[in-house]
Every structure is written in structure tokens, then in C-alpha cells.
């Protein structure tokens, strides 16, 4: 998967199209990512010993990785991800600017 935890992404399809956020979690086996403040759902929580009140909680749900695009670190625009070998290591690069994408977990 070309998107990692900590990346800044923009939603390019779906009900939250145009929103930007940071990737909180990735689910590589399902090809899904959880983005901060995007695809917020209301979840009904039963009362438990830890949370005696219960109630309705708002949480972010995962969206498909094809619906988000990485933001270029140089221009802050959506870009595709490429790979390049530097000093024997495979690094991610932004296709638009050629800038190396650092892993910022």
C-alpha cells in the first residue's frame, strides 16, 4: 500500500470529497485507511462498567485507499506515489515534484 500512517492525504471521492487529514491507521489486508476527521460515523454504545452512561459516540470509519491521494510535501497538492532506489533503499517519491516522501509516524 502506498499510503502509510502519519501521511497527509486528501479525499478525492465520496461524501467527504475535498477534505484533508492525517492518516490515523491503515488496514493493508482490506486496502482501507482511517483519516482524521473524515467519514465520521455515529456509533451506539451500550452502557458498560468502564462507560456506565453509554450513548452515541462519533468515530472515524475506514475508507478505501483508492478514494484518497497523498499530498505532495513541497506543493501541498494531491499527487501519485512513485518509488525510487536511493543508497540501496526503496523510498517513496511524489510524482508531481519528485520530492522524497518522509515517513512521519
Curated annotation (Swiss-Prot):
Gene3D superfamilies: 2.30.30.30. GO terms for biological process: translation. Pfam families: KOW, ribosomal_L24. One of its GO terms (molecular function) is structural constituent of ribosome. Keywords: Ribonucleoprotein, Ribosomal protein, RNA-binding, rRNA-binding. One of its GO terms (cellular component) is ribosome. PROSITE patterns: RIBOSOMAL_L24. The keyword rRNA-binding applies. One of two assembly initiator proteins, it binds directly to the 5'-end of the 23S rRNA, where it nucleates assembly of the 50S subunit. One of the proteins that surrounds the polypeptide exit tunnel on the outside of the subunit. Belongs to the universal ribosomal protein uL24 family. Part of the 50S ribosomal subunit. This is Large ribosomal subunit protein uL24. It comes from Staphylococcus epidermidis (strain ATCC 35984 / DSM 28319 / BCRC 17069 / CCUG 31568 / BM 3577 / RP62A).
Amino acid at each position: 500500500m502506498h499510503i502509510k500512517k502519519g501521511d497527509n492525504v486528501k479525499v478525492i471521492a465520496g461524501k467527504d470529497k475535498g477534505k484533508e487529514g492525517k492518516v490515523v491507521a491503515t488496514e493493508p489486508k482490506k486496502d482501507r485507511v482511517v483519516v482524521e476527521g473524515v467519514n465520521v460515523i455515529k456509533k451506539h454504545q451500550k452502557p458498560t462498567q468502564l462507560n456506565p452512561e453509554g450513548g452515541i459516540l462519533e468515530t472515524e470509519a475506514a475508507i478505501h485507499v483508492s478514494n484518497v491521494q497523498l499530498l505532495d510535501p513541497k506543493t501541498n497538492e494531491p499527487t501519485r506515489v512513485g518509488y525510487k532506489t536511493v543508497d540501496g533503499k526503496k523510498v517513496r517519491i511524489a510524482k508531481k515534484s519528485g520530492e522524497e516522501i518522509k515517513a512521519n509516524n
